[in-house]
């Protein structure tokens, strides 16, 4: 053993003079202010030519969302009218607020009762919140179109063929409600959904046409049979009346003669009742 004292390990604690990770957010803010000051100096030096780049005209149906050094500019969407853009540090996006009409491509849909149909629809929508349409989704218009297709397929897939053909307005209202709820977070307002056409397979169309024709023929036969029944009943009642009243028979006889004479025939068959010859037959006997 050495006479030297054994030294204990020394632990080094971080001192207050050691480097601390910088606050990147603070540095970025300072750098942003500096860049903004330089941009203003550049605008002033190049005035009035810089106004050609800084001033933008926004139409009545447009709004502009401005980002300054990556952050949304206070005040929300700008427009309509003239706005001021600082070069180098400002970026902006124009948003059209007009209603967009989108014709949904024909969708092959399997109904609840396993019938494949082709459905066409039209969706009318517009941007209601420009900031949400920029911040919350990459392309609000394209995303709304895709969602419209899937919503139409899902809504019609829960219906039978008969419900599809007879409840178009209810189906359109259901699609509008679902689509409007799905696009609300994107700043899009769905105005209306219309189901244009529901096309059936040719074989099913022919079968339905044959069924409808058979149903029409059956109804026609029923109506004809009911008419014959009513006519027979009327004839029976007339015969009972004539049998009870001989004068009515004579009147009917004269009416028939009048009808024959009105036809201007050269030959007229005059029916004579057998009872008229009864007296002559008795006299001969």
From Swiss-Prot:
Transmembrane portions of the chain: 27-47, 69-89
One GO location term (cellular component): cell-cell junction
PROSITE patterns: BAND_7
Presence of the UniProt keyword Coiled coil in the record: no
Keywords annotated in UniProt: Cell junction, Cell membrane, Gap junction, Membrane, Transmembrane, Transmembrane helix
Outcome of swapping residue 184 to V: In e580; no effect on unc-9 localization to gap junction in PLM neurons
Cell compartments where the protein resides: Cell membrane; Cell junction, Gap junction
Family from the record: Belongs to the band 7/mec-2 family.
Protein name as annotated: Protein unc-1
Species name: Caenorhabditis elegans
